[in-house]
């Protein structure tokens, strides 16, 4: 199956890239936080949050290939360290999501923990061995399943609610917070090592994969993610029964493992295969030990300041470009 998919991917990679881009951005929180936001904060804050999420990959795809020296800045050691530190937290968010969603089922959180660890170990091995292509293909398969499952779950859950839907407020008083969340989300994709690797992978074309207009893939990825969020909103109206909670847990697991694999691969990209392998094993092994200590508070801080990190990186890229340009002009005059 993978050999046929590999050949198809190499010949027409645009949709595969777009699905992988959407899958990487999703994370477990996109489903769980989306429902919590629409039910707790209201429709308008959810729509603003969804807009920020949809635009994030699109903005990256349009501007990252265009800004001179930006890739060089993000390849620098300080930026690699910053992005590398963020990757384990992203892995833990995915693993936490799997455990949390199974806690609402008869299977319980312990089963969720084992499932999360099993997927983490599986992807550590498969990505170490096969790299980029396997990550793109597994994202494609899992995300296709996500669309099928979320469509079916939404339709069934709304029908079985028999009109007894969750009452969502307009949330006009939360518009200010919604705008803030939207603006904080938009630059977030610039701190995803996997997205920069996709740019380089498309440019190098070392394994014969067809080179494409990569902006199209990122725009497609953003739109695909927005389409997924439309179903998240609809599911927030429904009341789930125990069977549907299990289906929901499977859905969130599929969403979470797509992001989990991309961030595990990002650790390999950032630190190299050998050191990356060790860090991936530590990330999975220390998950249950570190989470009770409150380490996710550090992630909350990093997420809130990432807009400043990205802004500083973009300014540094322009300064670097103009300094080099000035030096080159000076050398010509001499």
Q: Language-model segments: which ranges?
A:
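Membrane-interface "cap" regions at the ends of multi-pass membrane proteins
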Residues: 1-32, 127-137, 143, 149-153, ...
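C-terminal membrane-solvent junction of multi-pass transporters and transport-like membrane proteins
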Residues: 2-11, 137-138, 274-287, 300-334
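Residue-level recognition of pore/gate-forming positions within transmembrane alpha-helices
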Residues: 24, 53-57, 87, 120-124, ...
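Hydrophobic alpha-helical segments and their helix-loop junctions in multi-pass secondary transporters
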Residues: 88-115, 122-172, 186-188, 234, ...
């Amino acid at each position: 199956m993978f050999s046929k998919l590999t050949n198809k991917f190499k010949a027409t990679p645009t949709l595969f890239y777009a699905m992988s881009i959407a899958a990487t951005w999703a994370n477990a929180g996109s489903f769980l936080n989306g429902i919590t936001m629409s039910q707790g904060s209201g429709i308008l804050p959810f729509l603003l949050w969804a807009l920020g999420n949809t635009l994030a990959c699109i903005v990256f795809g349009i501007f990252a290939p265009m800004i001179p020296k930006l890739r060089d800045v993000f390849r620098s050691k300080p930026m690699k360290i910053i992005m590398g530190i963020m990757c384990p937290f992203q892995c833990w968010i995915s693993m936490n999501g799997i455990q949390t969603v199974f806690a609402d089922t008869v299977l319980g959180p312990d089963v969720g923990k084992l499932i999360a660890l099993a997927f983490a170990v599986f992807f550590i091995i498969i990505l170490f061995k096969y790299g980029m292509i396997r990550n793109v293909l597994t994202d494609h398969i899992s995300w296709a399943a996500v669309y099928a499952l979320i469509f079916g779950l939404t339709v069934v859950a709304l029908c079985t609610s028999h009109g007894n839907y969750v009452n969502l407020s307009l949330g006009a008083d939360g518009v200010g917070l919604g705008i803030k969340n939207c603006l904080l989300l938009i630059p977030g994709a610039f701190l995803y090592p996997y997205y920069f690797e996709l740019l380089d992978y498309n440019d190098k074309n070392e394994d014969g994969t067809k080179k494409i207009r990569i902006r199209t893939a990122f725009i497609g990825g953003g739109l695909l993610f927005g389409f997924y969020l439309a179903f998240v909103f609809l599911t927030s109206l429904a009341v789930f029964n125990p069977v549907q909670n299990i289906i929901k847990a499977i859905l969130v697991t599929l969403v979470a493992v797509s992001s989990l694999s991309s961030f595990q691969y990002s650790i390999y990209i950032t630190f190299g295969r050998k050191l990356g392998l060790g860090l991936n094993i530590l990330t999975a092994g220390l998950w249950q030990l570190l989470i009770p200590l409150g380490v996710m508070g550090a992630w909350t801080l990093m997420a809130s300041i990432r807009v400043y990190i990205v802004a500083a990186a973009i300014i540094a890229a322009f300064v670097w470009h103009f300094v080099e340009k000035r030096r080159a002009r000076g050398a010509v005059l001499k």
